[in-house]
Amino acid sequence: MTTHETQQSAMPSVWSPDAARLISFVLQFWFDNRRPPNTADVYHGAGFDDYTARRLYRELQLGFAAVVLDDRLQLNIVKALPFSATPTPHKLMVDGHFIAYLGCPGEAFSVSGLPMLDGIQYQVESYCACCYQPIRLSYFGPELQTPADELPTVAVVGNPHMWEHGVPADRVCDDFHFTLDDAHAERFGQRIGRRQLTMKSEQLAALSRPISQRRMRDPASRVWLDAEMHMNGFASVGVDISMWRAADDLGSAE
């Protein structure tokens, strides 16, 4: 998902070496096998027993890189960003073959930074949240090749204050949706009974780019969601965040 790190947070920005190794192993295994690894896969492939893996998964969850049922003996992986074990509208396809579900529209763009996609053509297949008409993004390596006039709109039906400080990634992803255009975004918001903020695909892609460029490459890729920094990030790419600011004003009113 998209985020800006707060410099004021005490949360370290760098993964421990073992956490960095584990998330890289999980993503590569998932890409190669079309599924997340289980505890035996992690033990044989990365060398971490279940006690160590549980501790590392908790570190990855706090750094917004994974969602794991760490209270379960099997340590079931729900998400390892950008991949999702739960079916979503967004599918990564390579040579016509399904690779993995992606968590949300933000991950439909940030997936482009994965090293295993360098130098190949692939697609993200999705659909409009309003009418279920198909949406398709085409890539070559990190480059989005879909013409601008064919890109979908993004409807955001949550507020950054709902996403910050340890909220799991799958909860954040649930607030981001592709729609065919602004009119479909408005109808989607009406249908689910929420106000939506509307943004362009290019804006979300720009927000996702710093994350995508660092994933599996830079150990300083740990993130910490902070509402103010997040809103400033959206504003920096031209998104109208007046709706969110109005909610801030309401919250501070006496």
Task: Report the location of each language-model feature.
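A short, conserved structural fragment
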Residues: Q61-L73
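Short acidic, hydrophobic short linear motifs in intrinsically disordered regions
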Residues: D32-G45
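Short alpha-helical segments that sit at the start of domains
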Residues: T2-S24
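Short, amphipathic alpha-helical interaction segments positioned at domain boundaries
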Residues: K79-L117
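Short amphipathic alpha-helical interaction segments
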Residues: G47-L62
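Short, cationic-aromatic polyanion-contact patches
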Residues: S13-A19, D71-D95, G141
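Long, low-complexity, charge-rich intrinsically disordered regions
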Residues: G96, A100-E107, L117-I120, C130, ...
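Short helix->loop/beta-hairpin flanking segments within DNA-binding domains
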Residues: R21-R35
